[in-house]
Design a protein with these regions (language model features):
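Membrane-interface "cap" regions at the ends of multi-pass membrane proteins
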Residues: 1-44, 48-53, 59, 65-70, ...
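Helix-loop-helix junctions that connect adjacent transmembrane segments
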Residues: 17, 54-55, 129-132, 161-291
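Extracellular loop-to-transmembrane helix junctions
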Residues: 39-136, 140, 244-247, 253-254, ...
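Transmembrane alpha-helical segments of multi-pass small-molecule transport proteins
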Residues: 58-60, 127-154, 170-173, 342-349, ...
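TM-loop-TM module centered on a large, flexible mid-protein loop between adjacent transmembrane helices
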Residues: 87, 94, 126, 240-306, ...
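A generic transmembrane alpha-helix motif of multi-pass inner-membrane proteins
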Residues: 360, 368, 372, 397-452
């Protein structure tokens, strides 16, 4: 314990958090944030974008994220403190790089709740089309906003229950799906085409689909924020990141492969946003469709969205408290002791964003991925600059070659993002750069605290 305390103090912070999390706790935390059934919500978009090679898109996405996970593991060993890519960029490169990386991740924080609401609302609208999509959106946003203001939080035990239920639903779908394939339902037969189809393969198209598929992997990096609470030593966080990524990657590939075999004609989806539920109905009937829809609504629209909304509201509260945003956002509810103004602002932003992207899940996912992928580029550069540039490391494989490969892969995926996501992303980046200049001119702190 003393050794761990010393390591943290070397970074300039006092060890104040209890080190109680095991490797398994860290891994479950990563699985909860990545959501093992994440492809349920974006399957149709990825399938159409990859010309039916949806399993390949997830495989490439997993490989890309593994190299990024290796860089996370390397930096978490060097800086075992609560934080993430923005902390590593700040310490590995400089304060300005850390600010920009944090600003880019902030884009994710703002847009992720909206995506979760859109996916969940689309799922429920598919089974109750009489209720307009906007009604479902308002309902999800209202429920989560009230819960977050009152202050009810999901505990670690609740997270474990949710992950178990998700895995049960996933197992049911895979088993029923495999039986449907064996029976030749909908003309299904076993083939490797979801992994590679020479007649349809186009690297550009597949990488475009990967740029959306990687959304399902976002969340593994959240494990890094628990570095100060891990009792497994420096390597525990890095190992948990890599293992959870591999586990969820395999689950993504299996479920999308089965789905692609049941409905091989990816061009005939009535609505790509709800394609997975139609496939579930073909495989097992209406009950399986309902089961996958409810699982998506609970996992995306309640569990994940509640945490995501709470996270961004506390970031806004923290920045307002540090005088980087209007002071009103730092107001705390007198009874519930929660940042209620920030929480309501997040709800308003989510409502505006969801209204604009209501039937454009793929585009919304790409906007989110712009922030994440660009921040990951900073991460890989941080490893090289810190270890090779500052520490003069001779371990070129770990500190130069691997992060360089990761940089190239992520850059290629980033290049294949759609035009809208790049336009919105660069506008956000430009605002961040101007804001950084203003902070420097007024000699104010440029750190963005995302750990509140």
């Amino acid at each position: 314990m003393q050794k761990n305390n010393g390591v943290v103090s070397e970074t300039g912070y006092k060890q104040e958090l209890k080190r109680s999390l095991t490797f398994w706790d860290l891994m479950i935390y990563g699985l909860v944030f990545m959501v093992p059934i994440a492809p349920f919500g974006i399957y149709g978009v990825v399938a159409q974008g990859s010309n039916g090679m949806v399993a390949l898109a997830y495989l490439i996405g997993m490989v890309a994220m593994i190299f990024t996970a290796l860089s996370y593991a390397t930096m978490s060993e060097a800086f075992p403190i609560a934080g993430s890519v923005y902390s590593y960029a700040q310490r590995g490169i400089n304060d300005s790089a850390g600010f920009i990386a944090g600003w880019l991740i902030l884009l994710d924080y703002i847009f992720v709740p909206a995506l979760l609401y859109v996916v969940s609302a689309a799922a429920l609208h598919d089974i109750v089309p009489e209720i307009p999509l906007i009604v479902w959106l308002v309902l999800f946003i209202a429920i989560n906003t009230v819960i977050n203001i009152i202050g009810i939080e999901f505990t670690a035990r609740a997270n474990k229950i949710i992950i178990v239920l998700e895995l049960i639903v996933l197992a049911i779908f895979v088993v029923v799906g495999v039986l449907a394939i064996v029976q030749g339902v909908n003309g299904a037969e076993f083939t490797f085409k979801p992994l590679y189809d020479p007649n349809e393969f186009s690297l550009g198209l597949v990488m475009g689909a990967v740029s959306i598929a990687v959304l399902s992997f976002l969340g593994f990096d959240a494990i890094a924020t628990l570095a100060e609470e891990s009792k497994g030593g420096k390597k525990a966080v890095g190992n948990a990141i890599i293992v959870s990524l591999l586990v969820v990657g395999v689950l993504f590939i299996i479920q999308t492969w089965v789905a692609a075999l049941i409905w091989p004609d990816y061009t005939s989806f009535e609505n790509a946003d709800v394609a997975f539920y139609q496939i579930a109905e073909i495989a097992g009937g209406a009950w399986l469709k309902w089961l996958t829809i409810i699982a998506t609504a609970v996992a995306w629209g309640i569990a994940d969205a509640l945490v995501a909304q709470a996270a961004i509201s506390r970031v806004l509260y923290s920045m307002a408290r540090d005088r980087k945003l209007p002071k009103i956002l730092a107001k705390v509810h007198p009874k519930f002791k929660t940042p209620y103004i920030s929480t309501m602002l997040v709800a308003i932003i989510s409502l505006i964003v969801t209204s604009f992207f209501a039937n454009r899940i793929g585009e919304l996912a790409s906007v989110i991925n712009f922030g994440a992928l660009t921040a990951f580029l900073f991460l890989h550069v941080s490893v090289i600059v810190y270890f090779i540039g500052k520490k003069k490391s001779k371990n070129y494989m770990k500190h130069l070659i691997l992060p360089a490969i990761g940089f190239v892969i992520i850059a290629f995926v980033w290049y294949n993002l759609d035009a809208l996501s790049k336009q919105l992303g660069f506008i956000w980046l430009g605002i961040g750069i101007v804001y950084l200049i203003v902070l420097k001119m007024t000699k104010r702190d440029t750190r963005i605290n995302l750990d509140e």
